[in-house]
Amino acid sequence: MPNGPEFVLAGDGPALEKQRGAPVLAALIGNDYDGFMKSWFWLVVGSVFLLAGLRAAENIPALPLGASAPDFTLPGVDGRDWTLKDFSGAKVLVVLFTCNHCPTAQYYEERVKQIVTDYKSKGVSLVAIMPNDPNSVRLDELGWTDLNDSFAEMKIRAKDHQFNFPYLYDGDTETVSRAYGPVATPHVFVFDAQRKLRYAGAIDDSERVQHVKKHYLRETLNALLAGKEPPTTQTKVVGCSTKWAGKQEQVKAYMEKLAAEPVTVARADAETLRALRKNDSGKFRLVNFWATWCAPCVAEFDEFVTINRMYRHRDFEFVTVSINRPDEEKSVLEFLKKKQASNRNLLFASSEREALINAFDPDWQGAVPYTVLINPEGKIIHRELDSIDPLALKRAIQKAMNERKPW
C-alpha cells in the first residue's frame, strides 16, 4: 500500500516542489511560503504557551507559613453553609482537605474523628473540605472506594462513617481549595488563635496506624495550646493528588480510550458455565445473567460497566452471560457494543436453557437479572436475585477485596 504524502516544512519554496505531496501543499499555501512558515511558527508557539498555561493552572502553590487563613463560605453535608467566622471561638483551627475516593484519606478517617474528640474540649476546631472536581476523577481512580467525590455521595459517607466534624464541598469551583493549595488528600493546615498558618502537611508519618512514629498534628496542637512553637512546621504530604478541574481533559481521553476497546461475545456451553462457577481465575468474579428482552437487565447494565471500570485493575473480573437464544447473537452483540462492555461476555450456546442453568447454579430458577459475586476459592459471597442495589454491590466487592488484599 503506498505511503501518504510527505510534507517538508523547511528550505525555500522551490525545494518543496521536489517533495512527494508538494502539489497538495502548494495548493494550500500558494506562493506565500514565508507567510505560511510564520503562521505555522506562531501556531506552534501559541500551542506551547497554552499547554504551559494549563499545566501552571494545575500547579497550585500551597499557602505559606505565617499566612492568614483564607476566608470561605461552603456548603456542608449537614445542609448548612459554613464560613471561617463560624470557627472564630476556636483557639486553634485545623483545616483538613480530604475526600471520599482516596484510600489514604479513608485510612485517616477514624484517626481524625478521634483527634476531634480528644481536642474539642481544649478549644480546637476541625473542618474538612473536599477539594476535588468530581469530573476530574477517572473511574479507575475509584478502585478503592464505593463512593465518588460528588456532594451527594459526600453526604452518604459522612453519615455512614459518623463524621463528627463539618465536611464541606468545594468541587464546583475549587476557589477555596486554590487559596489554600492542598497538594493531596489528606492535607492539613493548622492555624493559631490569630488564624496564622503554623503547620501544613501530613496528619502523621504513616497511613498504616501500626507504623506511625510521629504524630505531627497532635504534636502541633499540643504545642500551640501550650503557647509554644510546633516542633515541626511543614512536612511532605503522601496521598492522592488533588483533582483540579484541568484534569477533565485527561478523564475525557481516558473515556475515549475505554470506548475504543473491542467488544465480543462467545457462546457458553455447560462445561464453560461450570468452569465459570468454579472460578479458578485467582480473582473475585462478578457474574451477571441478563437478556436483551429483560427491562430491568437493560436498565441496570450501565451500572455493571461502571463497576467493572472501577475495579478491573484489582483482583477482579466481570462476566456477563446472556440467556438469549443463540440465533439472537447479533442483537446481543449490538447491545453490548452500544454499552461499551469490553469485559468477557458469554451467550447461552443452546436453547435448552435448563441444562445450562443447572450447570452454573442448580439453586437458580432461571429468572433474570441474576447476579453473583464469587471469591477466588469458588464460593458465592454475594447474590442478588433481582435488580442490583449498585451501592450495596460495590460495598460487597470492596469489603471482600480489601479483606483479602488491603491497599
Question: Which residues are covered by each model-predicted region?
Answer:
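Thiol-/selenol-based redox modules, centered on thioredoxin-like
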Residues: 192-265, 367-407
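Conserved redox-active cysteine motifs that mediate thiol-disulfide chemistry
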Residues: 99-111, 289-306
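N-terminal, post-signal-peptide region of Sec/Tat-exported proteins
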Residues: 74-118
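Short, internal strand/loop/helix patches
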Residues: 146-185, 189-190, 197-198, 333-368
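Bacterial N-terminal signal peptides
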Residues: 42-52
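A short beta-strand-turn-helix
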Residues: 72-93, 265-285, 305-310
